[in-house]
Curated annotation (Swiss-Prot):
One of its GO terms (cellular component) is mRNA cleavage and polyadenylation specificity factor complex. It comes from Saccharomyces cerevisiae (strain ATCC 204508 / S288c). This is Pre-tRNA-processing protein PTA1. The gene is PTA1. Keywords: mRNA processing, Nucleus, Phosphoprotein, tRNA processing. GO terms for biological process: mRNA processing; termination of RNA polymerase II transcription, poly(A)-coupled; tRNA processing. Present with 3730 molecules/cell in log phase SD medium.
Length: 785
């Protein structure tokens, strides 16, 4: 039975590929997805997953028979199902196909989110992206994640396993970097197409994430201690695409590549000497090809924008020439021409070094998860139909609207089908309809307003100006016709209304004159008598008192009448709202925090600030005073750790967006964290955690021009430990930013004596890791003597 059903799916796929694939292939995908969720076909889970992922990959790839306008919708529709498969599968092919699908569809879905402002779609895309990136250095799905650092063999076994998935993940990382950075040309999807004030996409956060992912690839080349040749070559090849399409990354990539020492890599456990020599030769060849590619395409030039550009050019040119000579010598001698008895000159790592390597591995994984904003726990599997129901409905409506529009556009050509200057009725649809003489049955009220605005603006921008003016003229003439029709009908209706009003007034006067004992006559008499008796204008309080008395008496009269005719109605019980769940509380807390950030960012120019300093924390004249309250609240006022950490995450993201202008707030926040816990005689764990997070987040953005800012931050932190100074290590090792790191260390030596021992240890580590830093390290060590 299973083979028969799979055979039917294969036949349906073949038939759809050759006959109207635009309409047939999505139906095959829907059928496969429904079969995958069918509990009676549990034995077919793996074959269906393989078939489904391969078909989605064929649909969203560049050479797909599906139109480019349809591919983003199809990719977005099945994001929840792909995430569920990735979390539950143990098959390498299925997981690899999912990663390749992300490579092809991530730019498309990101562009769709930018155009539709769909928060739910973006959340699903981020969940799948985070899951894939969190497993890129593991052997998932072949092995479960290893938590015990002392299990050396289990950790090291993951290094060269599942290479195909790792290479696919590297390709996906490069696609994320390309999609989330600016492009000099407008022919591809990039962050330049995202508005600065987009309601869903945070443009600075996306660009920051792209920089960190690029640094992650470069750091792998530098810090990986084993010769994983396939991964090294994959990263170098991916960097060639990034540096070609994003010239602004040239300095960053070339600086990292200069620190990539092929000779310093150790052979993998259990691999032969010949395997190590071949692996090393392949990596050197890829390195040389990268440099030659950069020179040939005028990427690596003497006129690079950095001051150290000429040195980078000369160093890379020399490395390329040296590698070429080594390759020629190896070719002439023969790579197999060596004495196996002498063994490999490279020694293996000791157990202690292996434990350090695994510890570094775990720290890098934690930093990656922190960058992506996820916890170290595995995400809970999601149910595809429940999560994507609203998204699928909206996508279906957009597809119907798109099909209807394309059909009308193909028939009408350059003229409007309905160009009558008079509308059929006084409805908006008849005024604006230029494609039908009757209702089009397109209910766009089901779509969100932001999507409607985006569709309208895109249509106006792409329309010919002459045709747009013609259409607007037709609509204007219809409005004019409706207005003239209304004006002509107003006089007769208003005169008849006046006549009826006069008749009503006469009847009312008769009732008052007859003194009839009705409720209306009593009420009118009560309202008119005070006006006749008052010789002068009473005070406001007296007038209000009289009005209240009159209202009470009127209510008593009407109440007595109602009691005689009907029973007293029972009072409805008070409304008791449902209590919020924990997730809802955190959601509203996050929204409230963002509103405070918007308020603090708003510049108040209506009132000038007073020159005298005020001791009030919440000052109406200071738009940023809410931040001081928020800092005090998060450090002292919220007992729930989860809620306070959520606000801290928002604070960190807000400060990093403009860290130069907000350095005072950063220092205030961290000092409050330290002071509150130390005043209670507690270990300042919150201060340590979030001060390290601040330094890790600032690392990718710091440049030499930020010297004053960074020295001030480091000098005003209330407590500095070895972990804080460890954040200076990558800055000191970076050739483009080393002066920033050493100037900061010099300042700490001079003005913060308690950290001198820690600085001394850091300088010794820098001397061991980079011989080119000996001179700078020795000059600072001399100050410590």
């Amino acid at each position: 039975m299973s083979s028969a059903e799979m055979e039917q799916l294969l036949q349906a796929k073949t038939l759809a590929m050759h006959n109207n694939p635009t309409e047939m292939l999505p139906k095959v995908l829907e059928t496969t997805a429904s079969m995958y969720h069918n509990g009676n076909l549990s034995k077919l889970k793996l074959p269906l997953a393989k078939f489904f992922t391969q078909l989605v990959l064929d649909v969203v790839s560049m050479d797909s028979p599906i139109a480019n306008t349809e591919r983003p919708f199809i990719a977005a529709q099945y994001l929840p199902l792909l995430l569920a498969m990735a979390q539950s599968t143990a098959d390498v092919l299925v997981y690899k196909n999912i990663v390749l699908i992300m490579c092809a569809s991530y730019p498309l879905v990101l562009d769709l989110v930018a155009k539709t402002s769909n928060q739910e779609m973006f959340d699903q895309l981020c969940m799948l992206k985070k899951f894939v990136l969190s497993h890129w250095r593991t052997a998932y799905p072949l092995r479960a994640t290893v938590d015990d650092e002392t299990d050396v063999e289990q950790w090291l076994a993951q290094i060269d396993q599942n290479i195909g998935v790792k290479l696919a993940t590297i390709k996906f990382i490069s696609e994320v970097v390309l999609s989330q950075t600016k492009s000099p040309s407008g022919n591809e999807i990039n962050s330049s197409t995202i508005p600065d004030n987009h309601p869903v996409l945070n443009k600075p956060a996306l660009e920051s994430e792209a920089k960190r992912l690029l640094d992650m690839l470069l750091n792998y080349l530098i810090e990986e201690q084993y010769m994983v040749s396939s991964v090294f070559i994959g990263i170098i090849n991916s960097l060639s695409f990034v540096i070609k399409r994003r010239p602004q990354t040239t300095i960053r990539i070339l600086s990292g590549l200069l620190r990539f020492n092929v000779d310093a890599k150790f052979p993998l456990e259990g691999k032969s000497d010949l395997n190590y020599k071949l692996s090393k030769r392949f990596v050197e060849r890829a390195y040389k090809n990268f440099v030659q590619f950069g020179l040939k395409n005028q990427i690596i030039t003497k006129s690079l924008s950095s001051g150290s550009g000429s040195s980078i050019y000369s160093k890379l040119t020399k490395i390329s020439q040296t590698l070429h000579v080594i390759g020629e010598e190896t070719k002439s001698k023969g790579i197999l021409n060596f004495d196996p008895s002498k063994g490999n000159s490279k020694k293996t790592l000791s157990r202690q070094d292996k434990l350090k390597y695994i510890s570094l591995w775990k720290r890098q994984l934690s930093a990656l998860l922190s960058t992506l904003g996820v916890s170290t726990k595995t995400p809970t599997p999601v149910s595809a139909p429940a999560t994507g129901s609203s998204t699928e409905n909206m996508l279906d409506q957009l597809k119907i609207l798109q099909k209807y529009t394309l059909n009308k556009a193909s028939h009408q050509g350059n003229t409007f089908f309905n160009n009558s200057p008079k509308p059929i009725s006084n409805t908006y649809s008849s005024v604006y309809s230029l494609m039908n003489s009757s209702n089009s049955n397109q209910d766009v009220t089901q779509l969100p307003n932001d999507i409607l605005i985006k569709l309208s603006t895109e249509a106006i921008l792409q329309m010919d100006s002459t045709k747009l003016i013609t259409g607007l003229s037709i609509v204007a003439s219809r409005y004019t016709d409706l207005m003239n029709t209304y004006i002509n009908s107003v006089p007769s209706s208003s005169s008849s209304k006046r006549k009826s009003d006069d008749d009503d007034d006469g009847n009312d006067n008769e009732e008052v004159g007859n003194d009839g004992p009705t409720a209306n006559s009593k009420k009118i008499k009560m309202e008119t008598e005070p006006l006749a008796e008052e010789p002068e204008e009473p005070e406001d309080d007296d007038r209000m008192q009289k009005m209240l008395q009159e209202e009470e008496s009127a209510q008593e009269i009407s109440g007595d009448a109602n009691k005689s005719t009907s029973a007293i109605k029972e009072i409805a019980p008070p409304f008791e709202p449902d209590s919020l769940t924990q997730d809802e509380k955190l959601k509203y807390l996050s929204k409230l925090t963002k509103k405070l950030f918007e308020l603090s960012g708003r510049q108040d120019t209506t009132r000038a600030k007073s020159s005298s300093s005020s001791s009030i924390l919440l000052d109406d004249d200071d738009s940023s005073s809410w931040l001081h309250v928020l800092i005090r609240l998060v450090t002292r006022g919220i007992e729930a750790q989860e809620a306070s950490d959520l606000i801290r995450e928002e604070l960190l993201g807000f400060f990093i967006q403009d860290f130069e202008q907000r350095v005072s707030l950063i220092i205030e926040w961290l000092n409050e964290e330290w002071f509150f816990q130390t005043s209670l005689h507690q270990d300042p764990s919150n201060y340590k955690k979030w001060s390290l997070r601040v330094l890790e987040s600032l690392g990718p953005f710091l440049e030499n021009k930020h010297r004053r800012f960074f020295i001030r931050l480091m000098s005003e932190l209330p407590s500095l430990q070895s972990d804080h100074l460890e954040a200076l290590k990558p800055i000191c090792l970076d050739p483009a930013r080393s002066s920033l790191g050493f100037q900061t260390l010099k300042f700490l030596i001079m003005f913060r004596p308690p950290v001198q021992d820690t600085v001394r240890d850091l300088l010794h580590q820098l001397k061991q890791e980079d011989e080119g830093l000996h001179k700078q390290c020795d000059s600072l060590l001399d100050r410590l003597k």
